[in-house]
Structure formats: structure tokens, C-alpha cells
Amino acid sequence: MTGKKRSASSSRWLQEHFSDKYVQQAQKKGLRSRAWFKLDEIQQSDKLFKPGMTVVDLGAAPGGWSQYVVTQIGGKGRIIACDLLPMDPIVGVDFLQGDFRDELVMKALLERVGDSKVQVVMSDMAPNMSGTPAVDIPRAMYLVELALEMCRDVLALGGSFVVKVFQGEGFDEYLREIRSLFTKVKVRKPDSSRARSREVYIVATGRKP
């Protein structure tokens, strides 16, 4: 019975996925994922990216966000990206494959950033979802806390942070923590984010001293 339910659920997901207008547009444009549109909407409202910036992309694969940011920061900009999964190369993106939760991977990522600070840290990280919020939300919150730690280490004063967060236990505390570190904080739900998803994007600008 469980197998039948899972099969029906998977079929619904596939049907929804392929009928999604953003998935269709991504395929037509040759984009790596529909996530490209989410970041485009955020950029239109918040103007995070400018030519020549250095950006850290966490949870980068398959590369939708990096693919978008390259068009905004130009040839003199730089992206340092990391994901547990492999990612096909993108010109202008320095990709590190590894588990961001691993201290050695974090160290390697910091070495790639080097001594100079970055202007934007962005995280689209999410754990493998079990479908049980009591399990999934704490896992997701752990990842976004790590992303915020990365901000503390590498983000320049006045820099920006954009992070995918799933609403649930710990969300309000996390939002308060970000507000203590940045001068302006917005919670965005892009049109290209599925309505039934718990995901929202926190956009924080103006890192405080």
C-alpha cells in the first residue's frame, strides 16, 4: 500500500514539475534549473549583484543560481560555488564538490575565498526531504545556520546574504539573528517558488560592523 501511495505521489510531482511554466521556460532558454527565475525575481527587487563582485554560492548544483549571477557580475566577477552533488563547469565559477557540513570541505572553501572578503553569500541548500516536518525542518535549519556562519567569516561590511529557509520551528529565531547582523532584511516568496512549498527566501543587505 505504501508503495502505491509513493508511486501516486511521485506521479503527481512529475506531472506538476513538467507542467510548471518555469520548468518549461527553463528548458526553452537552456537554463540549468527553474531556480534561475527565483534569483532573477530577487535581483529585480533587491539589486544584490553588480559587475566585478565576488559571490559564494552554497548548494549550487545543478548551477541555476551561478548561471544567473555570471550574467550580472561579468568577466571581472568571481563565483566560488560548493555542493555535495557534481556540477557541470560554468565559465567564471570555481566549483568545489563536497559536503558543506564537513570541516575539511569548509576549510577548502575558505581557502578558495582567500583573504579578501566577498560581496554576496547565497545559499539554496536543502536536505534530502523525508516528508516529515519534525525531521526535515531541523535538518534544514542546521544548513542555514552554517550558511550564516560562512557570512560571519567571509562577507564584507555592507555585503548581502540571500538564503532559502523553510518556514517552521526555528524560523523566527533565525530571522531575528539575521536582523541583528544586517541593516535591511526582507522575506521574499518569488512567484516562481511553488505556492504549496514552505520555502521562502530571506534577503539581507548591509552587513553591520
Swiss-Prot record:
Belongs to the class I-like SAM-binding methyltransferase superfamily. RNA methyltransferase RlmE family. The active site is at K164. Its EC number is 2.1.1.166. This is Ribosomal RNA large subunit methyltransferase E. Keywords: Cytoplasm, Methyltransferase, rRNA processing, S-adenosyl-L-methionine, Transferase. GO terms for molecular function: rRNA (uridine-2'-O-)-methyltransferase activity. It comes from Shigella dysenteriae serotype 1 (strain Sd197). It holds the Pfam family FtsJ.
